[in-house]
Amino acid sequence: DLISEGKVIYVDLEDMYCKHAETSFDLDAINNSDMNFAYDAMFGAGMNAVKRLLPNATLLHCDDNPGFLGTAPEPIHRNLQEFSDLIRDNNLDCGLATDGDADRIGLYDSEGNFVDSHHIILLLIHYMVKYKGMTGKVVTAFSCSVKVEQMCKHYGLEQETVQIGFKHISGKMITEDVLLGGEESGGIATTGHIPERDGIWMGLILFEFMAKSGKSLEDLIAEVYAIVGPFAFERIDLHIDNDTKHSIIEDCKGGKFTQFGKYKVEKVETTDGFKFFFDADTWLMIRPSGTEPVLRTYAEAATQEKVFDILADCKATIL
């Protein structure tokens, strides 16, 4: 009755979304390129839109499964091993994964290697500024790579670091001329769309970048490295009781930690948590979860080995 009376109206948001994407991207370039793209919806909300927008893509977990096959629909490498294998074993060029509500992105190169959000943010800036001639401010969360700031300096863009939580980025996107906003957990937004995270949208930008440049994802990452240098990043969550967590944070506030193993602290930033810099490109961050007995530790360095070494020294120092 409410429908017939016009009090309840059904709106096809998926159709609106796809039409918006069709006018915003060169989908012909993507769909007619020689490159083979893959998509893992993780049984989430992105499945039907991507089927429509990318009819030639290799699809995984694009059907309904209320239990998500027992795997949390979070696009991080440990949840995407099947997708990684699919890409590597079938000679696919690039794979996009999105989470349950399709706002966070995971990415794989042709070898099935996971590409983290820091690299994705840098790739997006590189494409939009160098290849498309766009400009604007870049806003990133406190846990993001220092390479973002270096990339922005290279291109003459203003960059601002904000607290963790996408609301801090969305607010800036609504009131300022922001080119891109991004956070470490895979939530990224760009101008010309909504001031909110959208994993499918970011994937389409990257697929378009590859298709129109004719370059592999690995080659495009090499272009980024030519500007900011190679780097690696990792986050490890330490599950500890709240008393221990509180004690460690008090030690951070009190300036107790001046060295972690062989890594000497040169400066500390405290925008949201504690970021201990060992040099301009190498840092460790400690931040408590606000909702659970977890201490989040993050590190960035030139190599993966060094990142894990820093995180191991951190754990040994604080616990």
Roles of regions detected by a PLM:
Residues D1-N90:
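Gly/Ser/Thr-enriched, mixed-charge loops and adjacent short helices
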Residues A21, D40, L80-S84, L96, ...:
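Buried hydrophobic positions in well-ordered alpha/beta secondary-structure cores of metabolic enzymes
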Residues M42-M47, A102-D103, C144-V146, T303:
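Gly/Ser/Thr-rich loops at beta-strand to alpha-helix junctions
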Residues N48-L53, G70-A72, I105-S110, V148-H154, ...:
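Short acidic, glycine/serine/threonine-rich loops at helix termini
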Residues A57-H61, F114-H119, G156-I164:
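Short hydrophobic/aromatic-enriched beta-strand-loop microsegments
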Residues P66-P73, I125-M128, I169-M173:
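Short, charged, surface-exposed secondary-structure boundary motifs
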Residues C94, M134-L319:
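Phosphate-binding and adjacent anionic-ligand microenvironments
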